[in-house]
């Protein structure tokens, strides 16, 4: 793989902002996702490429790759590759310079400092200096984006941020498992 490769675990909407900045800054990036990714703002997320095989956010095209070789070929073409690899098994093979955990699960799903020379996690659930090298604060407010080298991000409150005066009432949770089929695009 490329020499200064950065692997980002997760391709949801918040992860996409990080990925986009890394790509625009000239880094080679490989995104790892689950087989059925979810995102709050699906149409602003590179994870849509898992479903669509190809997806564009602003001026960055993302394509689903089946192998590391195909992912590298996409990078050579200026295309952002995404692979289905929920457990991060490709990380050891790819030997990246850095791993960014942008899954935003509010807990550590296995990312650790042995994965790459430098590791970063977005949001709560990680301890900088132990689990990863750095944690980025994701809580709305004046600490948003702060890089933490010792300690952790603000714990998850479980309550959505206030938008237009509304907080938890703007989030709907399903009462049962199943599939939701969108019949209209929400842009």
Where are the regions a protein language model picked out?
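Well-ordered secondary-structure scaffolds
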Residues: 2-187
């Amino acid at each position: 793989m490329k020499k200064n490769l950065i692997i980002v675990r997760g391709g949801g909407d918040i992860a996409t902002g990080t990925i986009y900045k890394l790509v625009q800054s000239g880094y080679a990036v490989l995104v790892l996702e689950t087989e059925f990714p979810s995102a709050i703002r699906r149409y602003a997320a590179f994870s849509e490429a898992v479903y669509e095989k190809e997806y564009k956010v602003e001026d960055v095209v993302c394509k689903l790759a089946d192998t590391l070789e195909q992912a590298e070929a996409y990078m050579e073409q200026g295309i952002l590759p995404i692979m289905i690899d929920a457990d991060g098994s490709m990380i050891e093979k790819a030997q990246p310079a850095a791993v960014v955990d942008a899954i935003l699960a509010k807990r550590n799903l296995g990312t650790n400092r042995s994965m790459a020379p430098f590791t970063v996690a977005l949001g709560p659930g990680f301890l900088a200096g132990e689990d990863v090298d750095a944690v980025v604060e994701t809580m709305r407010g004046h600490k948003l984006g702060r890089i933490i080298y010792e300690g952790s991000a603000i714990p998850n409150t479980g309550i959505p941020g206030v938008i237009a005066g509304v907080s938890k009432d703007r989030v709907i949770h399903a009462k049962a498992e199943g599939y939701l089929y969108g019949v209209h695009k929400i842009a």
